From Swiss-Prot:
GO terms for biological process: amino acid transport. InterPro entries: AA/rel_permease1 (IPR002293), AminoAcid_Transporter (IPR050598). Belongs to the amino acid-polyamine-organocation (APC) superfamily. Signal peptide: none annotated. Induction: Expression in spleen is up-regulated in response to anemia. It comes from the Eukaryota. GO terms for molecular function: amino acid transmembrane transporter activity. This is Solute carrier family 7 member 12. Inactive as a transporter when expressed alone or co-expressed with SLC3A1 or SLC3A2. Functional as a transporter when fused (via the C-terminus) with SLC3A1 or SLC3A2. The gene is Slc7a12.
Length: 465
């Protein structure tokens, strides 16, 4: 039994949109405009430039996914290029980043929905956590039903997101194309230019809004014709996202003044309240809709990383066993349980900021591994080969995203992030020394196979074919 290659170009594109289009477009424009010194052309240029940088980085990852078209390809690739310890470190980072991030997103969805019924006062904690748990476990069930079910859900989610952004983009042209709106752009070039430090901060803010394309590398083993589908989807998909982000920002600037954007907690909600004041209540549901797809993609991504690590012997074999729907059900359940703990003990969700540095470190390690294998194994079949300067550009971008916050505003949090990374190496040493003595997992695996009706999957080398 193996994971099914069931995703074509359409469903892969929908998953990419679902993972990439998030609530960042509702919040980030405020910070970008602020760091751009209220200079509209500079602000829009940063959004466009970061879109191009995102395509560059995504195409580098596409070479990894097409050379090793497996689920959890990033882990498999790092282990073979930089060694087991580095691969385990990436696993350590993703483990915490996924379950803390998923828990935080579920809580945010629940808070947005329940807040509609408690206007003027904060939403109560107990109903919020109960709804968050219900949402989380519902997505866990969807993930366990197989990649086809996940794809159809993300298709619906993507259509909602694309419809909302198209509505925001086109409303200015159809409804609010008045002289007073257009006049705000007439003197845009007269604003002062930001300094290099401010531009760096703005780029850092926008970069978070383009995260999500790595989901295709994680599910490469379930994509039909990955050598053609992945590069094509990344180029067209991120280009569409970039255009939508630009049009949405122009719409914000046409309806709201720069000062209104700067002082808004959520630019998207403020825009909605200004343009459609009679349906203000729908804003919270739209924010929730933008997060639903991210939660679904997060669970799938995390379970595939568990699956790959299990096949490589880092985790017990139970995590790589598949159910009747060709899904690693135990890995799905494990992620949902860990995320449930994060929701119940909501205070630990704030730890997610300590693993943010690790996400950029993983991308840096992948680029170094890609560069290394280019020179050590130049004859490996590469269905898609990215232009070499793109790899160096991605390395420079990762270094920029890692060190800019440390240089601009050093804090104790950065020390905690480094300690977190070193803890990963400590856990690797413990895992390497205790793995051979943990015979109790064999008995547990047998019982779990009967309980969940799961069976072992094929060797990763066989799945590449």
């Amino acid at each position: 039994m193996q994971l099914l290659r069931a995703l074509g170009v359409f469903h892969v594109s929908m998953i990419l949109f679902s993972a990439t289009l998030g609530t960042g477009i509702f919040v980030t424009p405020k910070a970008v405009l602020k760091y751009s010194s209220l200079n509209i052309p500079v602000s829009l240029s940063i959004w466009a430039g970061c879109g191009l940088l995102s395509i560059m980085s995504a195409l580098c990852n596409a070479e990894i996914a097409t050379t090793y078209p497996l689920s959890g390809a990033s882990y498999y690739f790092l282990k073979r290029t930089l060694g087991s310890s580095v691969a385990f470190l990436s696993l350590w980072i993703k483990l915490f980043a996924h379950f803390l991030g998923i828990g935080a997103q579920c809580l945010l969805i629940a808070t947005s929905v329940i807040q509609c019924f408690y206007s003027g006062c904060p939403a109560p904690e107990l109903p919020t956590k109960c709804l968050a748990l219900a949402i989380l476990w519902s997505f866990g069930i969807v993930s366990a039903r197989g990649i086809k079910t996940v794809a159809w859900f993300n298709t619906v989610s993507s259509f909602i997101k694309l419809s909302v952004l198209c509505l925001i983009s086109l409303t200015v042209l159809l409804v609010n194309g008045k002289k007073e709106n257009v006049s705000r752009f007439e003197n845009a070039l007269d604003a002062e230019l930001p300094n290099a430090s401010q531009i760096a901060d703005a780029i850092l803010q926008v970069s978070y809004s383009y995260l999500g394309s790595s989901v295709l590398i994680v599910i490469a083993g379930e994509i039909k014709r990955p050598t053609e589908t992945i590069p094509k989807t990344l180029i067209y998909g991120i280009s569409i996202v970039t255009v939508l982000y630009l049009l949405t920002n122009i719409s914000y600037l046409a309806v709201l003044t720069s000062q209104e954007i700067i002082f808004s907690d959520s630019v998207g909600v403020t825009w909605m309240n200004r343009v459609f004041p009679s349906i203000q209540w729908i804003s919270s549901f739209l924010i929730s809709a933008f997060l639903l797809g991210s939660v679904s993609c997060g669970i799938v991504s995390a379970s595939r990383v568990f699956y790959s690590a299990s096949q490589e012997g880092e985790f017990p074999s139970i995590y790589s066993m598949l159910n009747d729907h060709h899904s690693p059900a135990v890995a799905d359940i494990q992620i949902v349980i860990l995320s449930s703990v994060a929701i119940i003990s909501s205070s630990i969700i704030y730890l997610v900021k300590y693993v943010s540095l690790g996400s950029f470190c993983i991308n840096l390690l992948q680029m170094i591994g890609l560069l290394k294998i280019r020179y050590q194994n130049p004859d490996i079949p590469r269905p898609y080969k990215v232009w070499l300067p793109f790899i160096f550009g991605s390395i420079a971008l990762s270094l920029f995203l890692i060190f800019t916050p440390v240089i601009q505003s050093p804090s104790i949090e950065h020390v905690y992030q480094v300690v977190f990374l070193f803890c990963g190496f400590l856990c690797y040493w413990l895992q390497a020394n205790l793995n051979g003595h943990a015979t109790c997992f064999d008995t547990i695996t047998c019982y779990c196979q009967l309980l969940f009706n799961i069976s072992p999957s094929e060797d990763p080398e066989e799945q590449k074919n």
